[in-house]
């Protein structure tokens, strides 16, 4: 049985998409020496902040996202599949963003998209609450793909609890 070689990229996301795109590109290049079959990136690979207005102003639509364009090109040039853990993206005619994961084939094609289903809405105490549902639209579909005869399911952060 063939082994599946996976490189997991970890980095502390910044609040600007340009900074994160540069961090991802640097980390993609670092994986080359391992010759992975699959590269995985973290949740919120493009931007992270709790400021909803900043998010709405500084996120892009999927078709305009520089990280997707870069990942597709890298996948082709290096014959590697890429799972973008998630990107925070705008959607046409919607006031909320989506938290979307992508699977890009080694041919540079998006073969799967998954929108986070379970929003993290919680009251920690009187002073601390989190309401992802105020900013993000929940996904509806469970998604999986096959890579080298291995079934891979998608989940983003809080989805793991369900």
Residue spans for each PLM region:
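Cys-nucleophile CN-hydrolase/nitrilase-fold catalytic domain and related Cys-dependent amidase chemistry
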Residues: 17, 26-107
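Extreme N-terminal starter segment of soluble prokaryotic enzymes
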Residues: 2-7
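Short polar catalytic/cofactor-binding loops
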Residues: 10-15
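A generic short-segment signal for beta-strand/edge and adjacent turn/coil regions
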Residues: 8-9, 51-53, 64-73, 112-115, ...
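Short hydrophobic/aromatic-rich motifs at helix boundaries and adjacent loops
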Residues: 1, 41-45, 135-139
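Active-site catalytic loop in hydrolytic enzyme cores
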Residues: 92-162
């Amino acid at each position: 049985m063939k082994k599946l070689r996976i490189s997991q990229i970890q980095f502390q996301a910044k609040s600007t998409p340009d900074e994160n795109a540069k961090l991802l590109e640097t980390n993609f290049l670092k994986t080359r020496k391992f010759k992975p079959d699959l590269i995985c990136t973290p949740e919120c690979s493009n931007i992270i902040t709790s400021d909803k207005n900043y998010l709405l102003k500084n996120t892009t639509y999927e078709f305009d996202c520089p990280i997707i364009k870069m990942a597709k090109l890298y996948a082709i040039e290096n014959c590697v599949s890429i799972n973008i853990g998630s990107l925070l993206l705008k959607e046409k005619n919607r006031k909320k963003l989506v938290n979307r994961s992508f699977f890009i084939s080694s041919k540079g094609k998006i073969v799967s998209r998954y929108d986070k289903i379970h929003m993290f809405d919680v009251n920690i105490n009187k002073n601390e609450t989190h309401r992802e549902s105020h900013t993000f639209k929940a996904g509806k579909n469970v998604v999986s793909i096959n890579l080298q005869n291995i079934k891979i399911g998608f989940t983003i952060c809080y989805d793991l609890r369900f």
